[in-house]
């Protein structure tokens, strides 16, 4: 059984009511409603409960050491991370924004998450390092809390691919940096190489995805709705995650289960369409564990598969197997893509391919993250290295009205090893197992 890393910690502030204005740290502001109202702090520290993290403290210390090496090379005094993926990668805390800004400030000596008061002490319990809570009583208290750590007139590293124009202007006003440096590319390169601890978590995730896949397969029969099948897969995965990670927080796990024409797009939402005999199906399970994404994707048919569909399916499965064989150390992403393009062209189906052949894994979801430097596309020349984790997922979409119409996709997760790769996806692909119901 896997477990998250946790240790008891003393409560640094047991209640807000027991503290006088300003006792949490940071300036206070008189409310506009009159002097009889209690002054309210702009920020404070509220630390209580036991700290529980996805990884050991040493894992986060090592990540921060690598980051600080990058900061030193680029002459950065402090980094402000605002994206869910980088805040989680360097601190363990996966925030829930709900319209409020969140961040992580890293200096040469400090690592401090900045969170909203609505979360109370939960961000501290789930982060490595210090935590400051900002209040809603005055607009832009988030930026005042950030400035209390960074100071002014510093070289500030930030994520240009995440910071909005509005927030970028506020950074300039409140931090008054001497220079801003985009550090997003450097942090992405760091995230692309997975530590042993990360690979262990991803291995668990792949196994959970398989559990969801088998639960979905068991539900498939004529007359069942897509939503019914999807819920069965999602519930099975959430129960499995809770069994493997009893101290985790559970959020964001989902299923896309598509049938018939709904299979034409890889990211098409679930509907209430009822399954019919001969339908093409697309099974997609996505367990989320502490912000780490894994996936299983398979083509299936209800009851029977026609000759034209079987031909397209066989071609895509063959491309899938070829692609897996190409994912080895030293291979260039664009070269792998070119070889798979040639294979599809030989079979006269290249025109039915709609996106790349695979991508990196780690802290990402359908609304945060994505390590765009490690994708199997024509415009990515990254060379595969041991420690990288990447998918092989060719897809062909045959338009409605043509023989074999529908979307065909197989998806496995592979660890790049010293001498090849390891496929950690175990759910079978192909017609021998996936013509069901």
Mark where each language-model region is:
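Active-site neighborhoods and metal-handling regions in enzymes and metal-associated proteins
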Residues: 11, 19-437
């Amino acid at each position: 059984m896997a477990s998250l890393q946790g240790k008891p910690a003393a409560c640094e502030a047991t209640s807000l009511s027991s503290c006088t204005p300003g006792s949490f740290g940071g300036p206070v502001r008189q409310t506009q409603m009159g002097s009889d109202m209690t002054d309210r702090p702009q920020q404070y520290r509220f630390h209580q409960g036991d700290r529980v993290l996805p990884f050991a403290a040493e894992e986060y210390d090592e990540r921060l050491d690598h980051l600080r090496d990058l900061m030193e090379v680029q002459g950065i005094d402090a980094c402000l991370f605002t994206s869910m993926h980088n805040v989680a990668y360097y601190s363990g805390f996966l925030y829930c924004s709900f319209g409020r800004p969140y961040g992580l400030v890293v200096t040469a000596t400090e690592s401090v998450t900045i969170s909203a008061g609505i979360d109370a002490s939960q961000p501290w319990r789930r982060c490595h390092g210090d935590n400051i809570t900002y209040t809603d009583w005055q607009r832009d208290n988030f930026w005042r809390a950030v400035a209390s750590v960074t100071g002014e007139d510093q070289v500030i590293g930030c994520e240009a691919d995440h910071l909005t124009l509005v927030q970028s202007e506020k950074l300039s006003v409140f931090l008054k940096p001497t220079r801003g440096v985009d550090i997003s590319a450097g942090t992405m390169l760091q995230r692309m190489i997975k530590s042993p601890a990360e690979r262990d978590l991803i291995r668990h995730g792949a196994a959970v995805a398989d559990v969801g896949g088998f639960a979905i397969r068991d539900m498939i029969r004529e007359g069942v709705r897509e939503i019914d099948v999807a819920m069965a897969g999602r519930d099975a995965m959430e129960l499995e995650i809770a069994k493997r990670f009893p101290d985790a927080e559970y959020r964001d796990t989902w299923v896309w289960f598509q049938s018939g024409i709904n299979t034409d797009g890889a990211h098409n939402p679930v509907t209430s369409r009822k399954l019919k005999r001969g339908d093409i199906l697309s099974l997609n399970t996505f367990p989320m564990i502490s912000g780490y994404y894994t996936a299983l994707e398979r083509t299936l048919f209800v009851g029977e598969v026609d000759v034209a569909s079987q031909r397209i399916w066989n071609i895509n499965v063959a491309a899938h197997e070829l692609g897996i064989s190409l994912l080895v150390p030293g291979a260039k992403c664009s070269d792998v893509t070119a070889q798979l393009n040639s294979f599809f062209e030989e079979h006269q189906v290249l025109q039915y391919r709609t996106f790349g052949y695979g991508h990196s894994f780690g802290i990402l979801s359908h609304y945060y993250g994505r390590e765009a430097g490690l994708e199997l596309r024509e415009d990515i020349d990254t060379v595969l290295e041991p420690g990288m984790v990447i998918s092989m997922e060719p897809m062909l979409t045959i338009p409605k009205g043509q023989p074999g119409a529908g979307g065909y996709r197989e998806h496995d997760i592979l660890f790049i090893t010293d001498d090849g790769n390891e496929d950690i996806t175990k759910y079978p692909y192909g017609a021998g197992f996936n013509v069901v119901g």
